[in-house]
Amino acid sequence: MRCLPVFVILLLLIASTPSIDARPKTKDDMPLASFNDNAKRILQILSRKPCCSIHDNSCCGLG
């Protein structure tokens, strides 16, 4: 029973924290989804090139 008031206080403190990011966004901030989209786009471009393969990527400038 001694822990109950401490637990209630901690619960109230956790519930009162802001649910949004407190840091202001800068122009360099980029959502993670755009990084994933860029990676998918690059992989699609590389898979379209006939010379790019897992074993021989010398003509793509990767190896």
Swiss-Prot record:
What molecular function does GO assign, one term? toxin activity
Which InterPro entries does the entry mention?
A: T-conotoxin
Q: Which residues carry this modification: Cysteine amide?
A: C60
Look up the domain of life of the source.
Eukaryota
Specify the propeptide location in this chain.
23-47, 62-63
Q: What is its main location?
A: secreted
What keywords would UniProt list here? Amidation, Cleavage on pair of basic residues, Disulfide bond, Secreted, Signal, Toxin
Places the protein is found: Secreted
- GO cellular component assignments: extracellular region
Q: Which residues form the signal peptide?
A: 1-22
Briefly state the modifications made to the protein after translation: Contains 2 disulfide bonds that can be either 'C1-C3, C2-C4' or 'C1-C4, C2-C3', since these disulfide connectivities have been observed for conotoxins with cysteine framework V (for examples, see AC P0DQQ7 and AC P81755).
Q: Which cysteines are joined by disulfide bonds?
A: none
Q: In which tissues is it expressed?
A: Expressed by the venom duct.
Its UniProt domain note says:
The cysteine framework is V (CC-CC).
Q: Which family does it belong to?
A: Belongs to the conotoxin T superfamily.
Q: What is this protein called?
A: Conotoxin LeDr243
User: What organism does this protein naturally occur in?
Assistant: Conus litteratus
